[in-house]
């Protein structure tokens, strides 16, 4: 590493003008203070804030926390909002009816269960959910996960399959509610956006291929892996039938065109929402008029609202635990992501944990009325927002539309072609193929692109569960790697200033002979302390190679650690710091520390590091440390040890806002900045 080095002694001697160096006193917290907050650990601090917040809550605060709908009910503007909410609810309802039946088929269930899953959860979420635009109901990704998990346990034609799907909704709801109540939503932050994008892209491809059987007219293997599906499609090619293929492709083209037109022109956004219903109507008319024998129909659908019943088959709950946890994670990522974006767009605050609780309660109540797992939908939420929905009332209107469909329209659904439902699914998941995101990652961050590629590839070829586990594993590995290998910079002084910056970023910065300044840009703990020590040794060697300013400057005398970015230091790091100091001491190198924060300084003081290194070697600014170190580098060798500046004594001036000059027995002079180039 090439470093620019400046000989301060030469600059000092050549300067005819000099100014006295002034050191800012370092304020040291009293380690024996009776202030209880001085010794609080992060968990206790969080717990105390949480309990204090609970104590401050009034009756109405509790009502708003449990029932977020009261936040918008109290301030509802009927003349401004009602018409918008009504139209948005009708629009989403028209879109949801065909999508719900399509996603139920994707989940391996009868279409009626898609409508059941769109009824009660919608009403419950409108009361307990915190997002005012999120459209809750069946979604493609969760439906695929349900199918993939249950098909390995029981055949979809058996009644047990449906019972397990309903039980899965209860388990997912419990998971979500617990996470929301315990405020554990932050755990999802460890899953990279690259993993989410790669997973959804691969899942969209698998979903699309799984629906081709309704286009081709023959059975295709049910699998979450791409190769068995492709092999099955090729093996059954001799059974191909033209009528369902032509009808399915026609409906798919209509859906894609209507979606594109609705997105491109805001005034025609209703066309996008009407696409699925248009496709169903066209398919139903053709099937009713021409009766093509090769086109399979949905068949009879029960009429009426879902009845209350408690989920069954609890003896299979243990088998469903991994899948329910996976569905919970995917549902959270899909719902909370779009809910936050919509809240920011509509300028209101959204609590992720409250959102989790609302989704959980919706799934729990839904499972009591024959629903399978539901979550927020990207496409329907976007349509809801574009339709200018203002509050959760739009969700209530959507629920009424679904209820009317269950009561009056189900006899008409028996003539819907299966290929029409498949076309709706393929049209919906086409938007999940995030090729633009992959291009962006390739252009911006090759590591994230690698993570995207790994996740999508493993999901395609090894299945959804393996793909998610590997993707999350690599995501956590990257986080751990970054934490264990933190960024460390060698600092240099910018000419004409007292500012010290990374020399790689600012090549014009210079250092002083015999001194190396290192900034650690991360907390220091057991996982990264060895790496930090190794890097410090490397920097020391690199500095030595470029130092040749006379016999007294042929090596490093001082190492200054700039610790302002260090927010935390643990016991392992403290012990390693002691070892580093002892190692430096045997080689005649003095360690100095600049600007540690309060908690770090308290930890160092309690561990005896401050006394070990010397109180006089702790500074507020890097520049203070540099000037004192330069003085020792340049002073005559016979100067008494008693002449060391006692910065710790100066720090005893509590709350002092004035600069304190170095003691009179130390004559420190600094060349004027104009000459330091």
Swiss-Prot record:
Keyword Transmembrane helix: yes
Membrane-related topology note: Multi-pass membrane protein
Gene Ontology CC: one annotated term: membrane
Keywords: Membrane, Sulfate transport, Symport, Transmembrane, Transmembrane helix, Transport
Transmembrane segments: 84-104, 109-129, 134-154, 162-182, 190-210, 242-262, 270-290, 319-339, 356-376, 393-413, 421-441, 460-480
Function comment: H(+)/sulfate cotransporter that may play a role in the regulation of sulfate assimilation.
Transmembrane as UniProt keyword: yes
Localisation per UniProt entry: Membrane
UniProt GO MF annotations: secondary active sulfate transmembrane transporter activity; symporter activity
Protein name: Probable sulfate transporter 4.2
Protein's organism: Arabidopsis thaliana
Side Cytoplasmic, residues: 1-83, 130-133, 183-189, 263-269, 340-355, 414-420, 481-677
Extracellular-side positions: 105-108, 155-161, 211-241, 291-318, 377-392, 442-459
InterPro entries registered for this protein in UniProt: S04_transporter_CS, SLC26A/SulP_dom, SLC26A/SulP_fam, STAS_dom, STAS_dom_sf
């Amino acid at each position: 590493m090439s470093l620019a080095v400046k000989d301060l002694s030469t600059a000092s001697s050549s300067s005819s003008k000099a100014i006295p160096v002034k050191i800012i006193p370092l304020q040291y917290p009293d380690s024996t203070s009776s202030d209880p907050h001085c010794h609080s650990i992060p968990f206790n601090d969080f717990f105390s804030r949480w309990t204090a917040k609970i104590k401050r809550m009034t009756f109405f605060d509790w009502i708003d926390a449990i029932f977020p709908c009261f936040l918008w009910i109290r301030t509802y503007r009927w003349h401004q909002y009602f018409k918008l909410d009504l139209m948005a609810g009708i629009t989403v309802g028209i879109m949801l009816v065909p999508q719900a039946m399509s996603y139920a088929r994707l989940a391996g269930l009868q279409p009626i269960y898609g409508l059941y899953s769109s009824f009660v959860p919608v009403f419950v979420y409108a009361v307990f959910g915190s997002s005012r635009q999120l459209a809750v109901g069946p979604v493609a990704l969760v439906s695929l996960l349900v199918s993939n998990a249950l098909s390995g346990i029981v055949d979809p034609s058996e009644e047990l399959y449906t019972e397990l799907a309903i039980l899965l909704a209860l388990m997912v709801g419990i998971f979500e509610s617990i996470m929301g109540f315990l405020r554990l939503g932050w755990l999802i932050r460890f899953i990279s956006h690259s993993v989410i994008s790669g997973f959804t892209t691969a899942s969209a491809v698998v979903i699309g291929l799984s629906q081709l059987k309704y286009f081709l007219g023959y059975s295709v293997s049910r699998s979450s892996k791409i190769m068995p599906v492709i092999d099955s499609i090729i093996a059954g090619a001799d059974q191909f039938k033209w009528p369902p293929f032509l009808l399915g492709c026609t409906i798919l083209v209509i859906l894609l065109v209507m979606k594109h037109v609705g997105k491109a022109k805001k005034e025609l956004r209703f066309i996008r929402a009407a696409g699925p219903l248009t496709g169903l109507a066209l398919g139903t008319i053709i099937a009713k008029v021409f009766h093509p024998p090769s086109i399979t129909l949905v068949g009879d659908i029960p009429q009426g609202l879902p009845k209350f019943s408690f989920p069954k088959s609890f003896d299979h709950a243990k088998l469903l635990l991994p899948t329910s946890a996976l569905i919970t994670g995917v549902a959270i990522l899909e719902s909370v992501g779009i809910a936050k974006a919509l809240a920011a767009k509509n300028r209101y605050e959204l609590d992720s944990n409250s959102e989790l609780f609302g989704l959980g309660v919706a799934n729990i109540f839904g499972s009591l009325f024959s629903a399978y797992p539901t979550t927020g939908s990207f496409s329907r939420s976007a349509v809801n927002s574009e339709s200018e929905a203002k509050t959760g009332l739009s969700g209530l209107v959507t629920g009424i539309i679904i209820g009317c469909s269950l009561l009056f329209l189900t006899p008409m659904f028996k003539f819907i072609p299966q290929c029409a439902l498949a076309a709706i699914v393929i049209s919906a998941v086409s938007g999940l193929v995030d090729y633009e995101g992959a291009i962006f990652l390739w252009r911006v961050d090759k590591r994230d692109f690698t993570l995207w590629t790994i996740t999508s590839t493993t999901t395609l070829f090894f299945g959804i569960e393996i793909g998610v586990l590997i993707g999350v594993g690599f995501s956590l590995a990257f986080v751990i790697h970054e934490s264990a290998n933190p960024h460390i910079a060698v600092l240099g002084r910018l000419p004409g200033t007292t500012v010290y910056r990374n020399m790689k970023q600012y090549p014009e910065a210079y250092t002083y002979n015999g001194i190396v300044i290192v900034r650690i840009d991360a907390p220091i703990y057991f996982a990264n302390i060895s790496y930090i020590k190794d890097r410090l040794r490397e920097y020391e060697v690199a500095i030595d190679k470029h130092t040749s300013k006379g016999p007294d400057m042929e090596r490093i005398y001082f190492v200054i650690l700039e610790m302002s970015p260090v927010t935390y230091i643990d016991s392992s790091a403290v012990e390693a710091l002691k070892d580093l100091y002892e190692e430096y001491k045997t080689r005649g190198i003095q360690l100095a520390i600049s600007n540690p924060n309060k908690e770090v300084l308290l930890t160092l003081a309690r561990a005896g590091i401050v006394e070990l290194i010397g109180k006089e070697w702790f500074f507020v600014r890097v520049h203070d440390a540099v000037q004192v170190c330069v003085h020792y580098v340049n002073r005559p060798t016979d100067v008494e040890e008693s002449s060391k500046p006692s910065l710790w004594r100066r720090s005893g001036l509590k709350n002092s806002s004035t600069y304190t000059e170095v003691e009179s027995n130390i004559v420190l002079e600094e060349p004027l900045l104009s000459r330091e180039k």
